[in-house]
Design a protein with these regions (language model features):
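Membrane-proximal basic amphipathic "stem/tether" segments
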Residues: 1-47
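A broad, low-specificity signal for short, low-complexity segments enriched in glycine/proline
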Residues: 24-26, 37, 61-62, 144, ...
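Conserved acidic-Pro-Pro-aromatic motif
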Residues: 78, 83, 96, 102-103, ...
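SAM cofactor-binding core of SAM-dependent methyltransferases
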Residues: 47, 51-148, 153, 157-160, ...
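Short hydrophobic/aromatic-rich motifs at helix boundaries and adjacent loops
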Residues: 31-37, 89, 191-195
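Short charge-dense sequence patches
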Residues: 5-18, 44, 60-65, 165-175
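Generic signal for short, ordered secondary-structure residues
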Residues: 41-45, 76, 204
Length: 289
């Protein structure tokens, strides 16, 4: 590259870097302004605890606070997770936990992403602290996939994010029979505010097209979770994920489950840069102290 072109590229890179920093700063200011509103002041609410470790937005912090309030399970399945829809492994709801000594199962449909996981996470896969299943998840196979991994009974966390059949997969799971998660995280479609109850029709071969046609409304998921023995404790500030805790564990630790509308957060996807943590995600071993 000749010098004028090199200088121009360097200037462009600097401008893009500054623009990125400014976007993050603006989003962080908007997040702070939102959290200063009275409805988020109740100490039982969870939005203000949100932060991004490896999650897409603020889920890592919300989960950390949930488990602080209810404690972790005990026995052989303590600190164990199942996450359905994990991307390339570097941005999901359980990598932050894996780094802290948790163990569990990742399930994803994408062949290339699973290949990247096998390469990048070779050590925990070899040690057995992480299992990976490549499969297109549907209502018919989900129980078999989890059983084949040897996971049953109580686990601490189940996370579902497959951009379509989330409701139907959650409905099909043998809960509280074969599996009993203490906490469930599931994506909701924030297009539909309470009291709307809508669910995308089941299609085992559905593939998300990138639009807002996906999943289920918060109220529909809330009703399903109640039938399975769970209470709604939070949604995240960006309006992406809903958090449920098994009813026998919730106690008075959380905002009342009786008002879905109060716990609903609308779609604020443009706030996502506000949870940027400054570096591209990577994976490597750490020493637990």
């Amino acid at each position: 590259m000749d010098k004028p072109r090199h200088d121009m590229q360097h200037t462009l890179d600097e401008l893009l870097f500054l623009a990125g920093d400014q976007l993050v700063a603006v989003c962080q200011e908007r997040v702070a302004a939102l959290l200063a509103q009275p409805e988020y002041a109740d100490p039982r609410r969870l939005e203000r605890f949100g932060f991004k470790g490896y999650s897409q937005q603020d889920e890592d912090g919300i989960l950390q606070e949930i488990f602080r309030r209810i404690d972790l399970g005990s026995g052989e399945n303590a600190r164990r997770f199942v996450e359905i829809g994990v991307g390339d492994g570097l941005e999901n709801n359980t990598l932050y936990l894996l780094q802290q000594g948790w163990r569990g199962l990742w399930i994803d449909a994408d062949q290339d992403r699973c290949a990247a996981i096998r390469a990048r996470f070779a050590a925990p896969l070899a040690a057995g602290t992480l299992q990976l299943t490549q499969a297109i998840v549907n209502a018919e196979n989900i129980n078999g996939l989890i059983a084949a991994a040897g996971i049953k009974g109580e686990i601490d966390l189940l996370s579902i994010d497959i951009d379509g059949n989330d409701y139907h997969v959650f409905e099909a799971l043998d809960i509280p029979g074969a599996l009993s998660p203490r906490v469930v995280v599931i994506e909701y479609n924030a297009r539909f505010r309470p009291p709307v109850k809508l669910v995308q029709p089941y299609d085992a071969l559905y593939s998300w097209d990138g639009s807002d046609y996906f999943g289920a409304s918060l109220c529909a998921l809330h009703d399903l979770a109640r039938r399975k023995g769970y209470v709604l404790v939070a949604t995240n500030l960006t309006g992406v994920n809903a958090f449920f805790v098994r009813k026998d564990l919730a106690g008075a630790h959380f905002y009342p489950d009786t008002d879905t509308a109060a716990l609903f957060n609308p779609a604020r996807y443009r706030l996502i840069p506000g949870f940027d943590n400054g570096h591209l995600p990577g994976y490597g071993p750490y020493l637990l102290k």
